[in-house]
Amino acid sequence: MDTIHYMMDNAGYLATLTFQHLWLVLLAVGLAILIGVPLGVLIVRHKWLATPVLGLATLVLTIPSIALFGLMIPLFSLVGQGIGALPAITAVFLYSLLPIVRNTHTALDSLPPGLREAGRGIGMTFWQRLRWVEIPMALPVIFGGIRTAVVMNIGVMAIAAVIGAGGLGLLLLNGIGGSDIRMLIAGAVMICLLAVVLDWLLHRLQIALTPKGIR
């Protein structure tokens, strides 16, 4: 009950931290989509690049999050941004690349060869086939990677509070520092709720964007 009262009494503060957390995650994952999907297309077209690119993305994901955030501090200190949102967004961007690149590569690489041949047969260019045939067919799997990146990094971004990024991780950090169980539970609950709601919204968006014939 104490936790519920705490959340009700601090609803405005919780809302501010939630929107801050959401903005940080969506910006990082959005950048990863802009880079990761074209990178996935590139390694399908140039297959020799697949192993090094996916290997490097996998290597980044194996670095413990607290260590990666720590590595960002001296790097961004060179431009006067050692703590705050910029190093946190960069770290989460790097974490987001693997599921997006891998799912894009897997989805496009597993399409039936006859699909591409049919496109060539009617005179489509590579970009036309990609835009009108291949991406729509691969969209459910690509979206699966995006959803994985978002849900995974909602939790990862909470750790970014230790480098001054803000967000819901502040509740966990301050709760631990002050031995306040209410803040710890409130932070954990809000992070879980945010992950569940975003995953549901992305699932609905995936359904809306996927062609009816392959739903």
Model-assigned labels for residue ranges:
Residues 206-215:
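Short cytosolic juxtamembrane segments of multi-pass membrane proteins
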Residues 127-159, 186:
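Transmembrane alpha-helices
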Residues 103-142:
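Short cytoplasmic-facing helical segments at TM-TM junctions of multi-pass membrane proteins
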Residues 16-24, 71-99, 139, 183, ...:
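Loop-to-helix entry region at the N-terminal start of transmembrane alpha-helices
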Residues 39-72, 92, 97, 102-106:
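Cytoplasmic-entry segments and transmembrane alpha-helices of multi-pass inner-membrane transporters
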Residues 12-23, 54-61, 73, 77, ...:
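Alpha-helical membrane-interface segments at transmembrane helix boundaries
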Residues 168-204:
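Hydrophobic alpha-helical transmembrane segments of polytopic membrane proteins
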Residues 14-42:
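Transmembrane alpha-helix signature in integral membrane proteins
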